[in-house]
């Protein structure tokens, strides 16, 4: 049973609840503020992963299957019992769970925002949060979380002043600008 005085338990539960319920909010609902630094960072990192792997994640956007079972299956694949997991694997799992819970415009119109749908979404959020929490706080995965530095380690691992995509675009723009400037200078000298 979870120790209410254990900061890792508390932070893990709060982070998972923040992220899963954030993903499950109805369209046109304002984003609630993140409950912690790691929650803000998780939202940002998962958003980047979902954009980079949009084709994969979009295939699950309209999933009508059992969300909890899908998360369990993905957890079995990503957090294998044969190896220690990495932050990247954990974030991929959370991005997957968030995608399943996403109530994007298409799903909201299809489900007509009725009370029954809201109850099902809330139930699934609670089930997924509890599953992920129990998985991560189990002896094996908790030890790995601690070895990775806990949620402070998560923040250190992913915190960059600017995302990698920004630097790639900047590098490409700088290269192309230099190339075009050289070409224009070369042509101008020839005239």
Curated annotation (Swiss-Prot):
Predominant cellular place of this UniProt entry's protein: mitochondrion
Gene Ontology MF terms in the entry: calcium ion binding; identical protein binding
Where can the motif BH1 be found? 79-98
Q: Where is this motif: BH2?
A: 144-155
Keyword Zinc appears in the UniProt entry: no
Q: Which cofactor does it need?
A: Ca(2+)
What InterPro entries does the record point to?
Bcl-2-like_sf, Bcl-2_BH1-3, Bcl-2_fam, Bcl2-like
Transmembrane portions of the chain: 166-183
Q: Which GO terms describe its biological process?
A: apoptotic process; extrinsic apoptotic signaling pathway in absence of ligand; intrinsic apoptotic signaling pathway; microtubule organizing center organization; negative regulation of apoptotic process; negative regulation of extrinsic apoptotic signaling pathway in absence of ligand; negative regulation of intrinsic apoptotic signaling pathway; positive regulation of apoptotic process
Q: In which tissues is it expressed?
A: Expressed in multiple embryonic tissues. Restricted to the ovary and testis in adult mice.
Localization: Mitochondrion; Nucleus membrane; Endoplasmic reticulum; Cytoplasm, Cytoskeleton, Spindle
Location of cross-link Glycyl lysine isopeptide (Lys-Gly) (interchain with G-Cter in ubiquitin): 112
Identify the domain of life: Eukaryota
Into which family does the record put it? Answer: Belongs to the Bcl-2 family.
The record's subunit annotation is:
Interacts with BAX. Interacts with BCL2 and BCL2L1/BCLX. Interacts with APAF1. Interacts with ITPR1, ITPR2 and ITPR3; the interaction with ITPR1 is increased in the presence of AHCLY1. Interacts with AHCYL1. Interacts with HIP1R (via ENTH and I/LWEQ domains). Interacts with CASP9. Interacts with BCL2L11/BIM. Interacts with BIK. Interacts with UBQLN4. Interacts with NME2/NM23-H2. Interacts with PMAIP1/NOXA. Interacts with TPX2. Interacts with UBQLN1; in the cytoplasm. Interacts (via BH1 domain) with BECN1.
Q: What does this protein do?
A: Promotes cell survival by suppressing apoptosis induced by BAX but not BAK. Increases binding of AHCYL1/IRBIT to ITPR1. Reduces ITPR1-mediated calcium release from the endoplasmic reticulum cooperatively with AHCYL1/IRBIT under normal cellular conditions. Under apoptotic stress conditions, dissociates from ITPR1 and is displaced from mitochondria-associated endoplasmic reticulum membranes, leading to increased Ca(2+) transfer to mitochondria which promotes apoptosis.
Q: What is this protein called?
A: Bcl-2-like protein 10
Name of the coding gene: Bcl2l10
């Amino acid at each position: 049973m979870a120790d209410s005085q254990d900061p890792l338990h508390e932070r893990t539960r709060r982070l998972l609840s923040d992220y899963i319920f954030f993903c499950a909010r109805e369209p046109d609902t304002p984003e609630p503020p993140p409950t912690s630094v790691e929650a803000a960072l998780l939202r940002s990192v998962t958003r980047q992963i979902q954009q980079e792997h949009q084709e994969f994640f979009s295939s699950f956007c309209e999933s009508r299957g059992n969300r909890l079972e899908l998360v369990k299956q993905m957890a079995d694949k990503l957090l294998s019992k044969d190896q220690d997991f990495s932050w990247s694997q954990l974030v991929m799992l959370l991005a997957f769970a968030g995608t399943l819970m996403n109530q994007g415009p298409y799903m909201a119109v299809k489900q007509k925002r009725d009370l029954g749908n809201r109850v099902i979404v809330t139930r699934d959020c609670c089930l997924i949060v509890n599953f992920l929490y129990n998985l991560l706080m189990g002896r094996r995965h908790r030890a790995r979380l601690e070895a990775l530095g806990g949620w402070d380690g998560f923040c250190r691992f992913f915190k960059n002043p600017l995302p990698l995509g920004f630097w790639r675009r900047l590098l490409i723009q700088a290269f192309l600008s230099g190339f075009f400037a050289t070409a224009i200078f070369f042509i101008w000298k020839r005239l």
